Structure formats: structure tokens, C-alpha cells
Amino acid sequence: MNTVSQRPEFFELHNGSKSPLPFSSAEYERRLTALRQLMSDKGLRAVLLTSMHNVAYYSGFLYCSFGRPYACIVTETGCTTISANIDLGQPWRRSYGDNLIYTDWKRDNYWRAVNHVLPETDLVGIEGDHLTLAARQKMASLNSNLQAEDISNDIMTLRMIKSAEELSLIHI
């Protein structure tokens, strides 16, 4: 039997095929392009999305937390969901982009997975209206060089402009 120190902190699992998402690949790319423009304007190399609505909006994956944290990290070139091992391969199948699964074997594996995906950067955009004070402190304790900038209002402004696909779904 493996000891706790031999068990992985996080891993990737691409099992099965990608499931149909609520929107087309072009729609997710449109959203990510707009977010990346915001990132560029603010000098951010990454955004850490933690709310259910923004993770779903940018990745297509709607999580149920089961008391565990979830995220979507958008970088200049990628979109990666961070999910708990309890969901195994489902987040990868049900999201646009990549997925990294963290395990419960050791405390703070979620933050280790987040730090693994974040690029070498000193500034990351966050949802200040969703990330708790405890989570911000944990993020800072595991990466002392990382500064967080609240972009929650900017993200909400981006989401206010609806695409044709969004309007079509709303009218159903």
C-alpha cells in the first residue's frame, strides 16, 4: 500500500470522450479572447476563477463543490479547470480545455494544483467577491511572490454583453 507521501498531490485523467457543451467551441473561444484582452490590458498573465458561474461561463464545467474548492485558470494560452478527485474524469469530459485533478491525501493539494498551472507570474486576477479571506491567505502562503488583483467587476461587465448563442439559449 502506498503511504501518503507516495500518493500524488494532483494528476490528469482524460478518460472517455469530451461531452457536448452548452455552447460551441467558437463561443468559448470568443469568451476567452475577451478575457485575455482584459488580462492584457491589466498586465495579468493569468486569472483564477473560483465562482460556479464564472467557471461554467469560461469552461463549460458546472461544478458541485461537495465542500471542496474548484477553479478555472485562464492563461495567455490555456484554460484549465482544477477539480476534486471525487469527480475523477468528469470535469475534463465536460469542459472546454484541460483539467487537473487534486487529491485529498494531503491538506492544500488544491493550492498545489493551482500553483502548478499558474505561470511564473507575480500578478493574478481573481474574483474578489468570491475568493474568501482564508483562501487568499492560503494562496499567499503557498506562493509569497503572487499578488492578487480583483477583476470581478471587469469580468461581470464582459459577461453582460450577450452573444447570439447566449441569446438563443435565453429565448428557449
What does each model-identified segment do?
Residues 1-169:
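A composition/biophysics-driven feature that prefers long, compositionally simple stretches
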